[in-house]
């Protein structure tokens, strides 16, 4: 199958809170494809009706949309309906992993390690008992929306009095909020490409956690790949990540975030089914350490499209 003879839509932008990030990823992907002789075109679903792709002669989609509307199963479902092959995870894995709470519940059911958490919804917010939550989970706490990506709406809660306002803030972004035990150890992210686990990256943000600014804007966030784990720990992490990837039904490529608790135990955090592909992005950094260039990575992801 010669993909260079196909007309490829690079889906970028979109309508989520992560629109700008998706543009940055999309431009980098588009440039890599064009440089290698692919017939690729930028398509922003905010400006163009994706249902017309096939009619307009497109054969395949490289989906680099981030967040709701692009990474949550809806775009995948639309592409399935029109019969257009696309990169990344399918409808079910995309929809499931967009929901951090249900992803963690599934992992827990598989016996995989996740942080202890309390779930609060808009409906149950009035019954929230901060004292009881702190008694169970301790301090500090992490409060985050279940559905929004890119670390939007996060708060670190250091005192019981701050919990309610942190939940109220998170409720601006989603109806379901997770209050989680604070994981004090290393922050790691692990890419998976075509069922192969790539080297882990250790993230050391300048601030207290890896928020939107640290992720996309700050040059002071430090990344270490290799992550400085012993070979045994790297192996243990790779096995855990592959089990987590398979449990939620990922395919093609994804990146799984993992935190360590104070004792160094791994805790699964979330799945990114369309990881960032910018100059700052972590997936390309990891791939580079095993000799896969950015251009090769883009082509490989395209080749894995179903």
From Swiss-Prot:
Catalytic reaction annotation: 2 D-alanine + ATP = D-alanyl-D-alanine + ADP + phosphate + H(+)
UniProt superkingdom: Bacteria
Catalytic activity, EC: 6.3.2.4
InterPro entries xrefs: ATP-grasp, ATP_grasp_subdomain_1, D-Ala_lig_Van_CS, D_ala_D_ala, Dala_Dala_lig_C, Dala_Dala_lig_N, PreATP-grasp_dom_sf
Main location: cytoplasm
Gene Ontology cellular component terms for the protein in this record: cytosol
ATP-grasp domain residues: 104-303
PANTHER family, per the entry: D-ALANINE--D-ALANINE LIGASE (PTHR23132), D-ALANINE--D-ALANINE LIGASE B (PTHR23132:SF23)
UniProt similarity note: Belongs to the D-alanine--D-alanine ligase family.
Name the record gives this protein: D-alanine--D-alanine ligase
């Amino acid at each position: 199958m010669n993909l260079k003879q196909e007309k490829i839509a690079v889906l970028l932008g979109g309508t989520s809170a992560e629109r700008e990030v998706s543009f940055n990823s999309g431009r980098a992907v588009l440039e890599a494809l064009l440089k290698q002789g692919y017939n690729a075109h930028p398509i922003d679903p905010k400006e163009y009706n994706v249902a017309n792709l096939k009619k307009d002669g497109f054969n395949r989609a490289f989906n680099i949309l981030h967040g709701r509307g692009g990474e949550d199963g809806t775009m995948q479902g639309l592409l399935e309906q029109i019969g257009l092959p696309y990169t990344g995870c399918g409808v079910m894995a995309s929809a499931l992993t967009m929901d951090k709470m249900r992803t963690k519940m599934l992992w827990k059911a598989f016996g995989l390690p996740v942080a202890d958490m309390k779930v609060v919804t808009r409906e149950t917010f009035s019954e929230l008992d901060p004292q009881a939550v702190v008694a169970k989970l301790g301090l500090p706490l992490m409060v985050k929306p279940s559905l929004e990506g890119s670390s939007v709406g996060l708060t670190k809660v250091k005192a019981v009095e701050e919990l309610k306002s942190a939940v109220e803030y998170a409720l601006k972004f989603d109806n379901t909020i997770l209050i989680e035990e604070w994981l004090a150890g290393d922050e790691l992210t692990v890419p998976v490409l075509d069922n192969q686990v790539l080297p882990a990256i250790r993230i050391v943000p300048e601030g207290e956690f890896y928020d939107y600014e640290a992720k996309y804007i700050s040059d002071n966030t430090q990344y270490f790949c290799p992550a400085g784990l012993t070979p045994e720990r790297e192996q243990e992490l790779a096995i855990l990540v592959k089990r987590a990837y398979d449990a939620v039904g990922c395919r093609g490529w994804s990146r799984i975030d993992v935190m360590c608790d104070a004792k160094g135990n791994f805790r699964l955090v979330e799945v990114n089914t369309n990881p960032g592909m910018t100059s700052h992005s972590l997936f390309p950094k990891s791939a580079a350490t095993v000799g896969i260039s950015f251009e090769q990575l883009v082509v490989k992801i395209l080749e894995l499209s179903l």
